[in-house]
């Protein structure tokens, strides 16, 4: 039944006489499906096959373009550019279907957060594992201000997720890892502009949206966590305990059964193995999706933590996809995201300010990841990582054609609508190859056939309209059918290309190992496509050729003459060995002169 849960008349009061151009409106029905991510194209095709149905049409949602009521929304130029507003339209907000999910936790691992800010408090992550009084919250509004819930401040590490009762005592809304000993439980910040960086980041991650206050965030209704990483006695222009903060955010989210998206809007030069391994552990052991700012220097260089493996590195673009020559660019950058004139929350007076920096670009992108997770709750870290990068718009390279930045701004500028609506890519592995050849080895001049076995990993999407092709760097290799469509590969299934790839090795190729790439492409939709490649090595042996011995029986006789004549008359197509063995005068042409030489060889003249 394809998850159909309701069928109703499209126009309930349409009568038999309500007919126009052959369309009888009283006989049109609307079908509802449980899953809003169903493959509607295939469902439509299935319905059209039913004899009782004449026509099937999509019913597109028609509603006013959703604009949240946050008074500073019109100052947020980037919301429209990255199409967050279009992405929100997938939800029926007016009917109470709200984007976001409170179990999705976006962490500002930074200088700390003014978590009492009126645009943050309603989306504040509250650690209910520490809710000692059981009232369902860990903050209270008392005497005109928000405070940590006194009923939960019992001096006990209630959730004790690290099996150490003396560590994270009463971490009700996050943690200050820079405090004394294990830190302290209040990641609040001084009420001045020097310490506003983490608050500004938090607002971009998940400011409460549609609350008649301040700004909007793409994540809309996800939680925001504060992790303070610099002590108030230190210079707020530095992050002193950033990786400790990263680990807290990752583990706190993991053990609270939430989904952690961690933003690191800080960094610098210099690779550190310990930092890399910390990042990898947080990603693979604690399921944290990590974003980091690529840097604000107009140079091409690696920047850490953004250049570490398992981190989504984000550089900054300006309005209209502009590149204004102030942000870092590098081959390790994954995405570009708006980072100029970005308005968000600050500490002073619970106010707002417009800033620029990759520190802003990174949480703008991370907020999209929160929306993606709320749309696709089954997607995990590597899947969201893959899809947010794959769906970015490469228009930034068209707008900014300067050679020095090509390929250095990531896959493109983030696109919230594409990120939440594009079907999950497959994850393809090459599990086996078979080579069909005339001999036990591949010889110089041979022609072979290649068959591959490809497997699509479980929990990923279907490989749709896939193609494979073989590319080789050697000029002495000819691929007869270099691009080949193959059948779709469903998740957790394998596919064999029963029509083999035909490969000719020239007589001039050097013996030894030569490497080619099997390239796989699928799920192409305009600039979005899944691509992966697999190296395949061919070991080519030097051919031991006896000129004139076309049938390789180690003797030269009349049978070899017959084969040569048939080649000249095009009765047979020679293989690589026959091509060389029949060309007795080595002029690369097989003709009557070769027949004469062959006969003379037989007659021993």
Where are the regions a protein language model picked out?
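C-terminal subdomain of the subtilisin-like protease fold in secreted/lumenal serine endopeptidases
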Residues: 226, 241-247, 255-266, 272-278, ...
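Extracellular S/T/G-rich loop segment that most often corresponds to the catalytic His/Ser-adjacent loop
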Residues: 110, 303-374, 378, 412-414
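Intrinsically disordered, low-complexity Pro/Gly/Ser/Thr-rich segments with frequent PxxP/GP/PP motifs
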Residues: 478-508
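Subtilisin-like serine protease catalytic core
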Residues: 86-239, 257-260, 271, 307-310, ...
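Autoinhibitory propeptides
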Residues: 8-76
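Cellulosome-associated attachment modules in secreted, modular CAZymes
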Residues: 512, 536-605
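The feature captures the short pre-catalytic strand/loop hairpin that immediately precedes
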Residues: 170-188, 337-364, 395-402
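Terminal connector regions
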Residues: 502-542
């Amino acid at each position: 039944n394809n998850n159909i849960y309701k069928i109703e008349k499209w126009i309930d009061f349409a009568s038999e006489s309500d007919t126009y151009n052959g369309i009888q409106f009283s006989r049109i029905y609307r079908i509802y499906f449980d899953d809003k991510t169903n493959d509607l194209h295939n469902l439509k095709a299935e319905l059209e096959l039913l004899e009782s149905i004449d026509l099937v049409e999509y019913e597109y949602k028609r509603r006013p373009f959703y604009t949240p009521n946050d008074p500073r929304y019109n100052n947020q130029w980037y919301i429209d550019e990255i199409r967050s507003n279009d992405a929100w339209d997938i939800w029926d907000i007016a009917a109470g279907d709200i984007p976001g999910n409170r179990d999705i936790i976006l962490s500002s691992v930074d200088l700390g957060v003014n978590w009492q800010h009126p645009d943050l408090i309603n989306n504040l992550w509250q650690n209910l594992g520490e809710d000692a009084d059981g009232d369902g919250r860990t903050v209270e509004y008392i005497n005109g201000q928000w405070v940590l819930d006194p009923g939960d401040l019992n001096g006990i590490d209630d959730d004790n997720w690290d099996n150490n009762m003396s560590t994270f005592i009463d971490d009700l809304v996050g943690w200050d890892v820079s405090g004394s000993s294990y830190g302290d439980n209040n990641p609040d910040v001084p009420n001045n502009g020097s310490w506003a960086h983490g608050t500004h980041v938090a607002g971009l991650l998940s400011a409460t949206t549609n609350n008649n206050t301040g700004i909007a965030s793409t994540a809309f209704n996800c939680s925001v966590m504060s992790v303070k990483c610099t002590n108030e006695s230190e210079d707020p222009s530095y992050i002193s305990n950033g990786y400790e903060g990263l680990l807290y955010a990752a583990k706190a989210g993991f053990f609270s059964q939430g989904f952690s998206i961690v933003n690191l809007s800080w960094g610098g030069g210099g690779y550190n193995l310990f930092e890399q391994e910390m990042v990898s552990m947080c990603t693979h052991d604690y399921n944290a999706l990590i974003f980091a700012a690529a840097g604000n220097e107009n140079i091409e260089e690696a920047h850490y933590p953004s250049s570490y493996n398992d981190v989504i590195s984000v550089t900054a673009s300006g309005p209209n996809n502009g590149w204004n020559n102030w942000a870092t660019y590098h081959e390790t950058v994954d995405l570009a995201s708006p980072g100029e004139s970005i308005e968000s929350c600050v500490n002073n007076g619970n106010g707002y300010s417009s800033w620029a920096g990759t520190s802003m670009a990174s949480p703008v992108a991370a907020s999209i990841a929160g929306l993606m997770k709320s749309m696709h709750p089954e997607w995990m870290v590597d899947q969201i990582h893959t899809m947010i990068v794959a769906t970015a718009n490469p228009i930034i390279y068209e707008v900014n054609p300067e050679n020095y930045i090509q390929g250095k701004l990531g896959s493109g500028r983030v696109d919230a609508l594409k990120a939440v609506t594009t079907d999950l890519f497959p994850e393809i592995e090459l599990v086996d190859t078979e080579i069909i050849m005339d001999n036990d080895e591949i010889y110089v001049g041979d022609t072979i056939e290649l068959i591959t076995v490809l497997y699509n990993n479980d929990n990923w999407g279907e490989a749709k309209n896939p193609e494979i092709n073989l590319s080789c760097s050697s000029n002495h290799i000819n691929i007869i059918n270099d691009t080949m469509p193959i059948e779709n590969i469903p998740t957790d299934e394998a596919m064999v290309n029963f029509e083999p790839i035909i490969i000719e090795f020239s007589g001039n190729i050097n013996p030894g190992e030569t490497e080619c790439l099997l390239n796989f492409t699928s799920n192409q939709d305009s600039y979005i496509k899944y691509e992966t490649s697999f190296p395949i090595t061919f070991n080519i042996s030097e051919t031991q050729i006896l000129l004139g011995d076309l049938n390789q029986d180690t003797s030269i006789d009349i049978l070899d003459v017959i084969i040569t004549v048939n080649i000249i008359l095009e009765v047979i197509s020679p293989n690589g060995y026959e091509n060389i063995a029949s060309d007795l005068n080595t002029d690369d042409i097989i003709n009557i002169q070769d027949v004469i030489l062959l006969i003379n060889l037989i007659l021993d003249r």
